[in-house]
């Protein structure tokens, strides 16, 4: 039966498009993000590592933004989306945004589905999309933009 097991969904789920590997992973804690980046580096040592973090909950971002930044600094280029607030309200966390993470990482940038074309300049890359929120909205935007 093991040969029929395809692994857990949203744990380093890969899709190859040309010379780019898109990875979908549920990583939403700095330790999990570190594991995804390490796996990507080991599996694709010759590819540029370009993670996209989708921070989940405002409180987690506030608590761990420096830890996220320290882990993500190991990548070649980093993109961070807006925080997915889930059940939380931004008004309860003044001053907390994904910019906390971005400002800690030299060269890091904000990204959204409208800004997905920023990823097209990364050739021969592995792009892990990481977070609790299903990143299909970003991955689909990436693919749709390629077809234009």
Residue locations for each model-derived region?
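ATP-dependent carboxylate-amine ligase
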Residues: 1-148
């Amino acid at each position: 039966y093991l040969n029929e097991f395809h692994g857990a969904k949203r744990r380093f789920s890969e899709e190859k498009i040309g010379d780019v590997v898109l990875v979908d992973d549920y990583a939403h804690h700095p330790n999990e993000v570190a594991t995804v980046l390490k796996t990507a580096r080991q599996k694709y040592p010759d590819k540029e590592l370009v993670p996209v973090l989708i921070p989940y909950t405002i409180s987690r971002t506030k608590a761990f933004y420096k830890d996220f930044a320290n882990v993500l600094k190991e990548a070649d280029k980093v993109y961070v989306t807006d925080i997915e607030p889930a059940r939380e309200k931004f008004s309860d966390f003044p001053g907390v945004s994904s910019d906390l993470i971005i400002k800690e990482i030299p060269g890091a940038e904000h990204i959204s589905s409208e800004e997905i074309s920023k990823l097209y300049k990364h050739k021969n890359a592995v792009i892990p999309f990481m977070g609790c929120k299903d990143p299909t909205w970003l991955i689909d935007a990436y693919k749709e933009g390629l077809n234009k």
